[in-house]
Amino acid sequence: MLKLSDIKVGDILIADNIDGSEYKVLEAERREDACYFYIENLKTRVRSSLRIRDGNEARSGIAKIVHA
């Protein structure tokens, strides 16, 4: 399972879904309540935010990480 502490700006996140969308991490902020990421879909160039609150593991549909 992916640890949130492993995610850095510039990393590529690969979603755990049918098309395996790839997202580049543009910003990363860690707070006590959650981790917040600003990401960009590399195929569509759509930018969105991602908040993960479940302890220190990413359980938001992202399967693996590829370091840039």
Task: State where each predicted segment sits.
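Mixed-charge, Lys/Arg-rich low-complexity intrinsically disordered regions
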Residues: 1-9
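Short beta-strand-centered aromatic/proline hotspots
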Residues: 21-30
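Short aromatic-glycine-enriched beta-strand elements
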Residues: 34-38
